[in-house]
């Protein structure tokens, strides 16, 4: 079990985010002390009224009215100050959360892709949204309450000792009790709060998975199973929350109220019924009033431990993401010129020693067309990801333009090497925004790219042209049109190396022809690396690399590999047989119709 001293580094780091708002926070703290002094003055006025006016049967109207007006004025003044300081704390809290979310998103955007292979998306979303919102409560509720309670307690102690130091000494006996309760609460609540945050992240992750996979869930009638799974996650979160509520219910308000009542009884017994009669009624009233008010800020201080624990745990989760590894790039800013590729004895494993690529060698001259083929799981997409610099190599070296890939800067690598992925990401934005992706590219260049991939006619047919929104995940486009849009996205800034990861799979023949037309247009000034399932699309490749279980088993041109009658020849014959079978089936269907 970690002590408060172990939690302090995280809390200190969270509080440091408030440094840009030191001035408004300082003004808010000053307002708190002034408001506390105004609140504490109320019982002093009533004590004076009882001992000097009621007890002596001296009640001049002007003085009584003046005391009443002063009492009401002080309370209204305190309320106004509390409102003003609340606004200042909220302003600082919103600013802190905004900066924190910016930093978290920046950290997430700069993480290596390998981190997302094992980290559920819902967990990341929970840290950016839910955890940062809990941290907002640290400023709005915890810090504000602690400072306000401290100011109020301090002002009341000054007033109590000024009235009667003996009674004040009895009253402060509650402080050691409060300290013990806070230590016990912190010891037992921390692990429970961590479980609450973890279960909430699991719920977010589950919802994200269900929403993204809704079509599959409904297709295979899995609604009940996923509903049960989400119900179990919700029950776990509920049980953990109930544990915190039970702990709060026992250790906080009821227990402290009991101790406060016992001390109040002690005051009455020691001084209220004292035969010496040295304690005036007004003073006794003031002490009873202060002790009743003292109980509330002390309870608030201990109650805030629950929110403090949640904020610290949320901060740990946020900082874990922020302090995670960053995608590493080199410092060589020189842009790629020729687009040559050299893969020298490269081996790669996603984790441990389970190699998915073994001793791969490949040399691609400038402006050449190289194809990667192989069955599913052979390592084609992995090799493409390595060429993009997404993962560090386990062994060997990749050189682009004769320079180690690891030495290239972020700008040099991303401007020089582009990739069209198998499942293109389409933003819920306009045609134009999906092509430019925030880059400074003219509309004329966008139209040229759309013409190249044969999407210009589609864009013109839409209501607002290239300013037409494409819907969530590009639902207004077909699978083939998404592929063409992804290709246009990389062609607006012609890269030196273009990688197409399974770009000709699962698309219609018309889209395939459009892709081939676009590739023919860029081959003169771009090195092409194509991963193809349809071997008919790569018969013109300068080099074909055949992968099998992570190893390069064959390499050559289409004709050379067919003549060798190896694995490539087997794959080609299987595809021909499949195409002939599909053609005969279509012919039979047309005859029967």
UniProtKB/Swiss-Prot annotation:
Subcellular compartments: Cell inner membrane
Periplasmic topological domain residue ranges: 47-62, 162-164, 276-278
Gene giving rise to this polypeptide: mdlB
CDD domains: ABC_6TM_TmrA_like
Residues annotated as domain ABC transporter: 341-574
Name of the protein in its database record: Multidrug resistance-like ATP-binding protein MdlB
Cytoplasmic side: 1-25, 84-140, 186-254, 300-593
Positions annotated to bind ATP: 374-381
Keywords linked to the UniProt accession: ATP-binding, Cell inner membrane, Cell membrane, Membrane, Nucleotide-binding, Translocase, Transmembrane, Transmembrane helix, Transport
Keyword Transferase: no
Principal location: membrane
Similarity annotation: Belongs to the ABC transporter superfamily. Drug exporter-2 (TC 3.A.1.117) family.
An annotated Gene Ontology molecular function: ATP hydrolysis activity
Annotated transmembrane regions: 26-46, 63-83, 141-161, 165-185, 255-275, 279-299
Gene source species: Escherichia coli (strain K12)
EC number: 7.6.2.2
Domain ABC transmembrane type-1: 25-310
Keyword Cell membrane applies: yes
GO cellular component: membrane; plasma membrane
Membrane topology category: Multi-pass membrane protein
């Amino acid at each position: 079990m970690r002590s408060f001293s172990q939690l302090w580094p995280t809390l200190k780091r969270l509080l440091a985010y408030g440094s840009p708002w030191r001035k408004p926070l300082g003004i808010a703290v000053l307002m708190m002390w002034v408001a506390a002094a105004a609140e504490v003055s109320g019982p002093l006025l009533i004590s004076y009224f009882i001992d000097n006016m009621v007890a002596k049967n001296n009640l001049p109207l002007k003085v009584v009215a003046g005391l009443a007006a002063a009492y009401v004025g002080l309370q209204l003044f305190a309320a106004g100050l509390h409102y003003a300081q609340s606004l200042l704390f909220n302003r600082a809290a919103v600013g802190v959360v905004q900066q924190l979310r910016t930093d978290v998103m920046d950290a997430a955007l700069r993480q290596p892709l390998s981190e997302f292979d094992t980290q559920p998306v819902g967990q990341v979303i929970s840290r950016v949204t839910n955890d940062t919102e809990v941290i907002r409560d640290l400023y709005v509720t915890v810090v504000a309450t602690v400072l306000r309670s401290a100011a109020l307690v301090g002002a009341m102690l000054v007033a109590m000792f000024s009235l009667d130091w003996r009674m004040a000494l009895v009253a402060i006996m509650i402080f050691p009790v409060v300290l013990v309760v806070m230590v016990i609460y912190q010891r037992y609540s921390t692990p429970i709060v961590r479980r609450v945050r973890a279960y909430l992240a699991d719920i977010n992750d589950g919802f994200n998975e269900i929403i993204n996979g809704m079509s599959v869930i409904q297709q295979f009638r899995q609604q009940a199973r996923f509903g049960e799974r989400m119900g179990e996650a919700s029950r776990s979160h509920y049980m953990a929350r109930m544990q915190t509520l039970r702990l709060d219910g026992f250790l906080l308000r009821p227990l402290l109220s009991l101790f406060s009542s016992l001390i109040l009884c002690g005051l009455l017994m020691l001084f209220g019924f004292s035969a010496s009669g040295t304690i005036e009624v007004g003073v006794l009233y003031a002490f009873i009033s202060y002790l009743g008010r003292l109980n509330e800020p002390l309870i608030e201080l201990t109650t805030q431990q629950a929110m403090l624990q949640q904020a610290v745990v949320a901060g740990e989760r946020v900082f874990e993401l922020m302090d995670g590894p960053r995608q590493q790039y080199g410092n060589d800013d020189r842009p790629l010129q020729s687009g040559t590729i050299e893969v020298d004895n490269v081996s790669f494993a996603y984790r441990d020693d389970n190699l998915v690529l073994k001793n791969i060698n490949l040399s691609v001259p400038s402006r050449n067309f190289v194809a990667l083929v192989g069955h599913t799981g052979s390592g084609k997409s992995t090799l493409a990801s390595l060429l993009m610099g997404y993962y560090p190599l386990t062994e060997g070296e990749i050189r682009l333009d004769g320079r180690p890939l690891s030495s290239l800067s972020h700008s040099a690598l991303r401007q020089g090497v582009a990739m069209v992925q198998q499942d293109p990401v389409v933003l819920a934005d306009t045609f134009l925004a999906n092509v430019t992706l925030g880059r400074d590219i003219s509309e004329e260049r966008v139209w040229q790219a759309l013409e190249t991939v044969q999407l210009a006619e589609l864009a013109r047919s839409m209501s607002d042209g290239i300013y037409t929104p494409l819907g969530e995940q590009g639902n207004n486009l077909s699978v083939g049109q998404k592929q063409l849009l992804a290709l246009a996205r990389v062609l607006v800034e012609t890269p030196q190396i273009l990688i197409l990861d399974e770009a000709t799979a699962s698309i219609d023949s018309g889209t395939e022809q459009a892709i081939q037309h676009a590739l023919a247009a860029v081959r003169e000034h771009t090195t092409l690396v194509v991963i193809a399932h349809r071997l008919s699309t790569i018969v013109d490749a300068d080099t074909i690399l055949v992968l099998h279980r992570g190893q390069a088993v064959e390499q050559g041109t289409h004709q050379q590999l067919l003549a060798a009658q190896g694995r490539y020849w087997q794959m080609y014959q299987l595809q021909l047989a499949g195409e002939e079978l599909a053609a005969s089936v279509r012919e039979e269907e047309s005859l029967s119709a």
